[in-house]
């Protein structure tokens, strides 16, 4: 039995979960509405404010889908109540980020600024540098965990951190494996 899959999901007050045809799960909450088509063979039951996920058999596919299905529903419930966020750090001399309306404008050492329009249900928060050497904080915020992660990865891919000085965009919790520079000639 899947340890994650057998845990029930408690639906908080103010959140409405609808399980439709072919396991189309729709979650409405204070921050918005999320809808996702889950595997039709999984058994999703709602009793009051508790949702449970069961699998029809102990086959390899159903075992794999059990925990996944439960986690996807749980992520939707958390997303419409608290939301999801992914923190990034921008390191490098002259690397900047600013918001123009909802558009994120990044100066990353290219000959032009990079403009990123946010997808629906995604917003950006740009922090302040405390000193010139401190990294600049950038946070991607939204209700869909997968979409927040994809958007953060897309921003990071514009200038991934390099191993010599650590310049670039990295996740806040990410550790960069640093390399030593050239040894140089002895004089």
Swiss-Prot record:
InterPro entries hit by this protein:
Ribosomal_uL6-like, Ribosomal_uL6-like_a/b-dom_sf, Ribosomal_uL6_a/b-dom, Ribosomal_uL6_bac-type, Ribosomal_uL6_CS
Q: What GO annotations for molecular function exist for this entry? A: rRNA binding; structural constituent of ribosome
The intrachain disulfides are: none
Q: Does the keyword Ribonucleoprotein apply?
A: yes
GO terms, biological process? cytoplasmic translation
Q: Name one Pfam family in it.
A: Ribosomal_L6
| Keywords on record | Ribonucleoprotein, Ribosomal protein, RNA-binding, rRNA-binding
Superkingdom of origin: Bacteria
Which residue stretches belong to region Disordered? 151-170
**What GO terms fall under cellular component here?**
cytosolic large ribosomal subunit
**What the protein does?**
This protein binds to the 23S rRNA, and is important in its secondary structure. It is located near the subunit interface in the base of the L7/L12 stalk, and near the tRNA binding site of the peptidyltransferase center.
What's the subunit arrangement here?
Part of the 50S ribosomal subunit.
Protein family: Belongs to the universal ribosomal protein uL6 family.
Q: Know the name of this protein?
A: Large ribosomal subunit protein uL6
Task: Give the organism, scientific name.
Answer: Chloroflexus aurantiacus (strain ATCC 29366 / DSM 635 / J-10-fl)
Quick one: which gene encodes this?
Answer: rplF
